Every structure is written in C-alpha cells, then in structure tokens.
Amino acid sequence: MENQQKQLQQGVPELASLAGREESSVRGIDLMRVDQCEEIGVNQVPALSVPASTVAGAVAVPMSNEQEVKVIDEAAPIKRKRGRPPRAQANTPLHIRPPPPPPKKEDKEEDVCFICFDGGDLVLCDRRNCPKAYHPACIKRDEAFFRTTAKWNCGWHICGTCQKASSYMCYTCTFSVCKRCIKDADYVIVRGNMGLCGTCIKPIMLIENIAQGDNEAVKVDFDDKLSWEYLFKVYWLCLKEELSLTVDELTRANNPWKEVPNTAPKVESQNDHTNNRALDVAVNGTKRRRTSDSPTLPNKLDGKNPSNILKKAPGDTSWATKELLEFVSFMKNGDTSVLSQFDVQGLLLDYIKKKNLRDPLQKSQVLCDQMLVKLFGKQRVGHFEMLKLLESHVLIQEKPKGAKTTNGETTHAVPSQIEEDSVHDPMVRDRRRKMRRKTDGRVQNENLDAYAAIDVHNINLIYLRRKFLESLLDDINKVDEKVVGTILRIKVSGSDQKLDIHRLVQVVGTSKAIASYQLGAKTTDVMLEILNLDKREVISIDQLSDQNITEDECKRLRQSIKCGLNKRLTVVDILKTAATLQAMRINEALEAEILKLNHLRDRAKKLELLKSPEERQRLLQEVPEVHTDPSMDPSHALSEDAGLGTRKQDNHVKAQSKGPQNKGVNLNNVGNNVQKKYDAPILRSRNNVHADKDDCSKVHNNSSNIQETGKDDEESEIWHYRDPTGKTQGPFSMVQLRRWKSSGHFPPYLRIWRAHENQDESVLLTDALAGRFDKATTLPSSSSLPQELKPSPHDSGRTGADVNCLQKNQMPVNTSATSSSSSTVTAHSNDPKEKQVVALVACSGKVEDGNSVRPQPQVSCPASISVVPGHVVTPDVRETPGTDQYNTVRADGNHNTTKTLEDETNGGSVSINGSVHAPNLNQESHFLDFPSPTPKSSPEDLEAQAAETIQSLSSCVLVKGPSGVTWSTTTTSTTDAATTTSSVVVTGGQLPQVIQQNTVVLAAPSVKPIELAADHATATQTSDNTQVAQASGWPAIVADPDECDESVSDLLAEVEAMEQNGLPSSPTSTFHCDDDDDLKGPEKDFFNPVARMSLTPETCRLDVSQTSILDNVSAGKSSMLTEAKDNTPFSHCGTAGPELLLFAPPPPPPTAISHDLTLTTTALRLGSETTVEAGTVERLPKSVLGVSSEPSPRSLSSHDSSSARGSTERSPRVSQPKRSSGHSRDRQWLNNGHNSSFNNSHNNRQWPYSNSHGYDHGSGSYAAHPPKGLKICKFYESGYCKRGASCSFWHP
C-alpha cells in the first residue's frame, strides 16, 4: 500500500511536467481551433495521464480519491491496437480515448430551385450526396427527359471554364471551377472547397451589413417578397444557419492562388466591422510582424467602399461603355457620373422591376426590351448571366494603394501591380484586357543552378538538326563553338532491323576527316565527336537525323544520365546552348507556321471558290473526260500479239535441233498411227513436188512456195483443235489461241488445223504461234505426206533414180549417173521448227514402171538428206530394224509390224532417217504402184540391178572440199561393167536440220559379195556460191580423233568373239566417241542421224579385205532380224582429222527378190546413234548387230547408244545415255484423234512425247535387266563411273 502511494506521489511531478508540455503545445494550434483548445484544463490532465501500472493496481487498493477511481473505471474498457503505435502518437498517452467522429448528417434535399430559389415541381441531381434541386425550365430541359432512366448531373459539378470535373463550388449558385481554372477565376474560398463567386459575395455582404447600409452608394430592397432578392436572402440565411457560417469567415475568405508567388501563404484575418486586430499566421503557427518586403494584394471588397472610388467630373465618360452610359443616363436623368459596378447592378435591377421584365414562369429569366437588347445583345438572359454581361461594360476604377499603414507599420503594394499601373493609366483599368496581360507576369528561371528536366521541351531547345548543321558549314570557324553541348539524334544498330532505334547523344567536340565527303550539294571534312553512352565516337554529319525527338528517346537519355553515363544538364547549360540555336529554331518555326497558314489560306480560297455559284455553274456545264485505251483496239491487240509470237528468222541452218526440254530429253514418237491409202491422182500436197522430165537435176528456187503467216490468219477464225474429251472445238482466231496458250490453258503439244483442212493436216500450236505454218515448211507426218511424182522414161533397160536433195539455200544440185536415163523425185520438206527445205539427195535408185521400186541397199546419209528411189523423199536418216517399235508399211498394202531377215528373204534394205522434233510422227503411209511409161521389171532384172546399186551405195562418203561438203558414192561392180558414181552435195559446212524422221526400207535382191575399192572414191566439189551456215558448229559436235579410232577389223574381230560366246549379233557396230556424256554441250546433242559426226578432207573407205570378210560372213544362213532395242549404232572409221561416218553395205543373200517397198516413220531420240540397217546379213556377229533376241519392254521409250567392243583386247567403252528430267508424262489431251497402232502397255500414251529413258540390254554388256524405273549406268562395268554411290543410274 505504501509503495503504491509513493508511486502515485512520484507521478504527480511527471503529470505536472506533462501538463506544462500540453500547455505549450496548445499555443501551436491554429487560431480557428483556439476555442476548442481552451476547454482543456491543467487540472484535468493528471487524471487523463495516469500510468498504466497504477491503473492496473487500483483494483486491489482502496482509494480515497473518488475522482481517480472514476478515471480508472472509465479507462479500463479501452482497447488498444496491437503492434507499435504510430510516431504521431508516440508522445501521447496510450490510454486516452480519441474523440468520437462527428455524426454524419443525413443528406437533406433542398426544396427550392438552386437557380431561381423558388419552389414548385423540382428535379434532383443524380450525383451522390448532391442535395440541389432545379426546375426543368431553369436548366432548359423537358420533363420527358427526366422520365427516362438516364442519370443526370447538374452543372454544379462541372467546371464552367474547361468543362472538366469541378473541385471548388459556390454556395449560392452553380458557379464551379477546377484546380487549374481557379487561378484565374473570380472566386474566394470560405471553407474547404466551398466558397463564393464574385457575383454572389457582393449581395451577401450587403445582407450581412444591413446596419451599415446607409454607407452604401446603392440600396437594395431585400424585403420585397415578390422580388428575386428576397428569395436569395432567404436562401442565404437558411444556408448560413445550417452551415454555421460566420461573418469572420466571410471577411477572411480569399483566393490563395492569387497571392504573390514564391512566398509563404499568409491569411489576413481582418474584420472591418468589429475592428479586430489583424494577425498574420505563418505556416509554423507563430506570429510574425509584417515587413516592408511582404506585399499584400488589395482587398477585393474595397470596391464597395465609396472612399476607394475616385469621383470624376460629371462629364467624364471613360468609366463605362457607350451602351452602359446610355442606360445610366436614362436611369439618372442624363447623369453619367462615375458609378461602381455594384451601383450599376442596382440600377439594372430597378429598371427590370420598374418595367416588369421578369418572366412570370421563370423568375430567374429576364425578358429584354430594346434598351437591354442593346446592352446585352439577347432577347432573353438569365439573372446571373445578366450580371456577368454587365461586368464587360463597366470599366472598374480603383484607387491605387501605394502605401498602407497597419499597426504603425508601412506596407507597400505588389511590385507587379505598381509596374502595371505605371504602364497603364492608374485611374482606369479595363478588365476585358486582363487575360491578355497574364503572360507578362510569367515566372522566369529563378534558380539558374538547378538541374534541368530531360523532357521534349528542354531537349528541343538544344537539339541540333542536320539542316542546322549544314547551314553552319558556311562559316566553318564558328562550327565548333556553336555545336559543342548540343544534342544530336543518331541511329543505333539493333538486332531487329525493322525497328528504327535512335539515341540522343551530346556533342563534345569537332575534328577533321582524312578525306572530304559529300554532304548534299556541299563538300566538307568536319567530323563530330559525340559522347555515346560511356565512350567517345567520331561520326560524320550525314549520319545525323532531321526528325523530331520522341518522349521515349528523352526517357532513355534521362536513364543514361541517372546511371552516370552522361553529364547532368543544368538550367544555365541549356540556356547557354539554346542561345546559339535560337535564331535557327525561330526561323524554322516561322517558316513552318507561314507554310501552314499559306495552306490554310489556299484552302479557304478554294472553299470560297467552291461556294460561289459561278464555280457550281461551270462544273455543271463541264463535259466529262473519258479515258481511252489503245490496247482495246482489235487491230492494236493483233499487232501486239503478233510481235510476241514472231521471231527473227535466220537463213542459216542451225547446228542443233532441240526438243521441248532442250538437253537430256528423249522424244519418243510413239503416237497414234493412222493408216491411209492414197491413189496417185488424188494425192494432195501443200508442197508440190515437181519432177522435170528434161532436166531432173535442176531444182528451181521458188520462194513463193514458202508462205508466211499474214494478218488475215491472225484475225480470221479458222482454227480448230480437239479437247481432252475428244470434241473438236472452233473455229477460233490466232489471237484467241495465243492468249489461251499464254494463260496456260493448252498443253505444250496441242495441234491445230484450219477450217478447210482435216485433222491429219494439223500443226503444232507452238509452231503456228511462232509463224511457222505448214504451207511451205511443215511436213506433218508420213500419213499425210502428199507428193507428186513424175518419173522420166528410160532409154535403156537399166534404170537409175536420181534424187535431188534440196537444201535450205535452194541451190541446185548437180548429179551424175551412168545410166541413160533416170527418174527424178523432188520433194519440199516443211519444218515447223526451222522452216527448212529438205535437200534431195541424188542416189542410185531404180524405179520400174512407177509401180514397183527396185530394192536398194540401205545407206545412211546425212540427217537432212532423204533417199527414196523413185518415190518418196524422207528427211530423216536412220536405220530401221524390223522391231515392234517400227511399223512397216509394204507397197502391197500389208501392215507388217515385225520384220525379220527371213521374212525379207535376205533382201537388202536402205534406211535413211532424219532428225525430228514434231510429235506424232509414227504414222504409216501406203504407196501404191504408180503408173509408169516403162514396163515392169522382172525379178531377174531387179536382182541384177540390186547388185549394181549396192556397189554404188557401198562407198557413200562425206568429202569436204574448198566450196563445201560433198557426199560422194563410188561404186565398183563385179557383175556389171557399168560403174555408177553419184554425188550428193551438202553445202554450208553443216548439215541442214529437218523435222520429221521417215525411214524407207527397200528390199534388195541377192547379189554376190561386193568388192569395194577405196581408190575409186571421188570427191565432187560444189559450186562456190553455196552459203556456209554455222561453220563453227561442226567441230563442236565432234569427239576427239583418238576416241574414235576403232576400225572395222576390230569390230569384226569382236563379232567373232561374241559368236563364240553365243551372244546375239547386230547388223551394225556401235559408234561411240564420247566416254562421258556429262561433258556434252548443246552442240554435241545434234540431230540423231549425224550425232557426233563431222567432216574430214579424207575419204572414209573400206578395204577389200573388209569386203572379203563380209563375203565370208554372208555365206552363212540368214540371221533373224529381231526386235531392235533402243540403240542401233553404226560403224565408224578412225581418222586423223575430224570423224566421218562409214556406210558399209553388207553382201545380199542369194535368195528371192523382194518387191516390197516399206516406209516407216520413226521417232526422234535425242542422244541416240544413227543406225544403218545393213540388210539381210547372214550370221553377222551379235556385237556388231547390237540387238538382243529378247525384246525389251522399254524399247520404244528410249533410243540410246549401246556399247560395242572393238576387239577382244580393247577395253569396252560405253556411251552414257542422256539424263532424263523426270518420269514419263502422261498427257491429258488426246492426240488429235489418231489411234495408236502399238499394243504395248507401257507405250500406250495419250500424247506422243515421253520423258522416260530406256537402255539397250542387248549389246552384250549386261546380262540382267534393270529394275523397273531404274536406268543402267554405262560407265559402271568399264570402271569409268565417277559418281559412285551418288550416281542416279543402276549399277548391276
């Protein structure tokens, strides 16, 4: 007990000291709370400050002091929050209960309109806690608007200046402003965010100072219950009582934003009515005496005091406008003396009351008469609107306060106000111009050492554009001092090239470049040193940017400055640098503004022009312009399309005939053959073949036979074609076909024909589009090959046929023959690709009575030469073994698809082939026995003549003379004394190129073995006027001489070796000069019959020993001529110069004579060897024959060269076939209605072209067939394949 009492006694001094601190702290409280703080006494503090320990022990100790027990009991239920108390409460006792919050008053809705202060049917604002009510007519809304569910907020919550949310509102009207607009608004704050506007505070001050109403210049009657002033007074008194507003609060109300800047806000507490002492309360709450450096603003309410208004002479009218002076003169009987604004308002209200101009339905609205319309310019104005409009007519005259004495101290007016009064008339200030002078008081840079903000505004002041720097180059000496410290904008390289990232860097210096560089129209060597983050770099001026800087770039610069990578910029630095760029920045801004205004002026002028009736009338009378397109003219389209299809025609013979895929494509003309028979009188021909009875060796150069495509063919609709469904479409014009072809609607090998023609006379669409028609140049197919044959009569029993080969140069060919007379056949071959004229080769042939053709041995001639004794000229030279891929048409009309040596009864045959490009050439022609004035020859005569013919064709050689190339045939007959020598002249240094490949197979009678004498070979030179065409093409297509050095003896030795091994024999040997076809160029891919062949000055000839060998071979039985494989090579001879072909006729067998004439059209096989059918050779070595007894399933799809062995000692050399670009292509389009005569399933194509390649499996090199779809590599067995495992061919 004693201890507790001692503790209580010891606590008394502490409480006393605490009370002293509380008393000192009360002095710091705002004077507005002085009355509340005075209620706290010193005697009450000890009871409120009892320690907690004492309180805890008070329950067990009986206390005599009832007051202490009462305090403890009251403090016991106090709940304390857990945790450390806030710092503000650290020094205060924890057990003191905070004062309870003031009870919230329920929102009361007002029952009068907030505008007219009258009752009636009112609507409430939907904003929360807004009690204001309005008449719908006062807010200019219909009652139907408020029946909707839409929410409506009154104008009290919207700033009247910027229409944003308001922050400060007036007590007695809908005036409200936001935080930004309050700086310039006529508004004073009374309590919190509530205050009074300049219009409402004046009548309120009149209401509050009614006792001093005698001092007012104008008296207003607020007691008239029928006036608006009475309603306003009632509303204010009710509001004042509800809010407990005092007169002191009204007098201390001000606008703190209109105080002098950069000074501590001071509140002047001054009550003019109670004469209280004014106190200036600082921020810290201590009293401070006002010094001479503390200016004050003039009181806003000084205008109501008559002492502040300067009285002027009655004649002075500078205080108001003309309209207001007229109104005042009317109200005061001509007195226009100076009045205050409040006096003018009183006069205006009296005038409205006297004239009864208020709207009876809306008391807040005034109906203006003629006098008020002049003053306000409206027929109807509101009350507050009227008072505001009146302010613009009153020029307020205030008495300047140069000095004011307060409590014995001198105070000065605001310096800015003194300066303003010194500039303008100190007696008159027009408030309408106040807003224009607000920029004069703009705050300048006070602290020049402060750090500048890194924003777009500041950086633009020191931003050096590229064009600025270009203008500074005129004065090179001042560049350094003007650019140092400026900011540049450069592009930085980033990972994403799509985004242009720029960086702001600062210039730290300049330097000179080693070499000058071009900068627009100027040349300079100035380089800029920049601080790029943390390193110095030197850049040229052309790397700078002229574009405006962005906020992101300023943000990155600000971040780099904060990281210490760049120097911090101060206000002085920016001002100093901006001064150097000020002139350039101003010039640029002015130019941009002037340009903008010029554009606006032009647009205004244009707008004025468009609004004028003259322009409208002119536009109505203007004739619209229609654009023209020359390409829509049909004649223009024809000429344009014709120019695309035509190309320059060269008179020279091209060295190579290329297919659709150029190199490496085998064109297999396994088409649909149509068998037709033509009688001699009805043979139709677009290329008439005339034979001169008197001079068969002269061929007239008739250029009129060659017809070019004309304009009529382009425009006329005469062309037909067949679609994939088999229907014939047409007629169409060439223009339409060309467009459809370019659009890809047609396949590459579509054939078309004219309306007056049939489908058999069709031509390729590609050739027709190129202007190559079949009028004079196309030999479409053997089935549609009409020829006119005119045989000449024979003077003796021996008949020889001279065939004149007409070349492209149309030069006459001289031939010679020992026979007394010979029949002549002249043919023009039409080539749609090259427009060549097939040369007719003069060879020894026999025609008997025009009905049967004497058998002739088979001779291979150049590709452009066709030899058909007495009947047909075929421009292709090729050996045609009797296989299933060649359809043989015999003269008697029998269709023979397989021809063997036994069927031919050992009859010799002559095959002359030419290179082709056109598809669908495997068509058969049946030639009947033509009428002839000569009697038919007997079989015995044919047998005798065959021997002579074989000898005449045995030495068919190529001779290159000074004037050209000559085919010469020298014959030495053992059975006939007559010797026939015929020459075929081929000029131009190159064999002509032909389009079709027709093979003529003639059965020859059996004769004795032939003895060939090489010495009898003669060379016939052509005339000097022959044209040389592409002479450089011959060496390019010839292999090296050392690669073609196999002789006939080597081949025959190989034949015997292969016979002993039981291998099948071949009638010919393989001509292989290329060991690697991969190195072949386009020149080596010459047309088939003369591929890898060139001319030589020497004559390729056979020895007698070779002839004897052939005699010995022919003594045996006749061998079966089986189905020929892909490649049928021919023998060659090795020479020191360019390589020549050797055509060695075999000895005929002694069997019956064949009277058959077979004409076979074969397809072109690019890259294959020229073949020569040697006739019915008996037991020739199988390696020479180069065919297999087993038919190849792909014999028709490829014709590649097979390998041949020169001797048993020589290593075999295999010619590699040409590569294929892909598998065979099945065409969707039908082949113009031609039916295929082949029954092979793998060759039953819809289109004649095939891309697949086959291989010769009968050459003796390979024993097994390749897998389906694979091809044999020719170089694998010989070990020459360099591709190895990467080779795309089959390695068996």
Curated annotation (Swiss-Prot):
Residues 661-675, 813-829, 1188-1206, 1231-1244 have a biased composition (Low complexity). Residues 1-24, 72-107, 256-313, 401-426, 624-731, 777-832, 876-915, 1170-1245 are annotated as: Disordered. Residues 689-698 have a biased composition (Basic and acidic residues). A zinc finger (PHD-type) spans 110-176. A zinc finger (C3H1-type) spans 1267-1292. Residues 1-10, 404-414, 699-708, 882-899, 906-915 have a biased composition (Polar residues). The keyword Cell membrane does not apply. Residues 716-770 form the GYF domain. It comes from Arabidopsis thaliana (Mouse-ear cress). InterPro entries: GYF, GYF-like_dom_sf, Plus-3_dom, Plus3-like_sf, SWIB_domain, SWIB_MDM2_dom_sf, SWIB_MDM2_domain, Zinc_finger_PHD-type_CS. CDD domains: GYF, PHD5_NSD, SWIB-MDM2_like. The keyword DNA-binding applies. GO terms for molecular function: DNA binding; zinc ion binding. Residues 313-396 form the SWIB/MDM2 domain. Residues 453-586 form the Plus3 domain. Keywords: DNA-binding, Metal-binding, Zinc, Zinc-finger. This is Zinc finger CCCH domain-containing protein 44.
